[in-house]
């Protein structure tokens, strides 16, 4: 939705340009400005919606997702998330989980493999020019990135093609389920930010990168005196409606 030309994408079909903002309103204004002036990536229509942030709109139906990250999440973060979902339910939102609908269970079961599919897609696409960087000066490449480059070296074209086909299936499954709700709601991370310079786990963000859906992380919870995010995810090109829902969720949980 936002043009990446002028920057460097390690994996062409997986990377995206995101907005870090002090408010969801500022996020929307900046994203629309970028899309209107630079467009989306070549061949893509860019971000749909008005220049001004959409008004807050209560989401009637929310699908709560555990995703691949739930088993890595600490108990305090799980409790904070469940408490926030309870508040949304008390406010009148209909809440659905994998226990309520076989289609949600099927979606959860499939996207539980997001780490594997993410690695197959990302590692294969990042091989060039990463191979050259590795050959030129391997000592300057961080250990995690170096391991990723080496993992990509073992992937075959057949494996990449299979991963592309699986992504098409994920996108179809996501579109069908997203039509039945106003937003999907997982955590943003397995816990609060780690101490030090480690960027932490991105396991809760992998599915949105694979599918290409809009996702907004809302810092509406606190664990260990640190912010913890709740994501809301929606249909592809449904950014404006998702932003309206996000404004309402933020206002409801932060009041």
State where each predicted segment sits:
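A short helix-breaking turn/cap at a secondary-structure junction
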Residues: 1-83, 254-255
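Short, well-ordered beta-strand elements within core beta-sheets of diverse protein domains
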Residues: 15-22, 150-155, 232-233
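Generic secondary-structure signature for well-ordered alpha-helical cores
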Residues: 19-25, 32-40, 86-94, 135, ...
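Acyltransferase
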Residues: 76-99, 131-136, 160-181
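Short connector loops at secondary-structure junctions
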Residues: 93-114, 149-150, 220-222, 227
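Charged, often glycine-rich, active-site loop that binds/positions anionic groups
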Residues: 108-129
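Structural motif of enzymes handling amino- and sulfur-group chemistry
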Residues: 142-150
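Glycine-rich, small-residue loops and helix-cap segments
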Residues: 144, 155-255
């Amino acid at each position: 939705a936002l043009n990446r030309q002028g920057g460097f994408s390690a994996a062409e079909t997986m990377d995206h340009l995101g907005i870090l903002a002090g408010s969801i309103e500022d996020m929307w204004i900046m994203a629309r400005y970028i899309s209107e002036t630079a467009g989306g990536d070549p061949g893509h229509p860019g971000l749909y919606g008005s220049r001004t942030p959409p008004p807050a709109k209560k989401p009637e139906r929310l699908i709560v997702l555990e995703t691949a990250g739930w088993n890595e999440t600490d108990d305090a973060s799980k409790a904070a998330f469940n408490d926030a979902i309870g508040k949304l339910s008390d406010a009148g939102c209909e809440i659905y989980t994998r226990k309520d609908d076989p289609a949600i269970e099927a979606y959860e079961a499939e996207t539980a493999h997001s780490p594997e599919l993410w690695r197959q897609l990302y590692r294969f696409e990042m091989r060039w020019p990463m191979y050259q960087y590795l050959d030129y000066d391997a000592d300057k490449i961080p250990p995690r990135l170096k391991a990723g480059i080496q993992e990509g070296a073992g992937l075959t074209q057949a494996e990449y093609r299979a991963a592309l086909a699986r992504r098409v299936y994920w996108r179809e499954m996501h579109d069908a389920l997203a039509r039945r709700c106003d937003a999907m709601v997982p955590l943003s991370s397995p816990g609060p930010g780690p101490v030090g310079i480690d960027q932490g786990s991105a396991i809760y963000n992998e599915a949105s990168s694979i599918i290409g859906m809009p996702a907004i992380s809302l810092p509406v919870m606190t664990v260990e005196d640190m912010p913890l995010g709740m994501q809301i995810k929606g249909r592809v090109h449904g950014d404006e409606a998702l932003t309206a829902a996000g404004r309402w969720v933020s206002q409801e949980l932060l009041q």
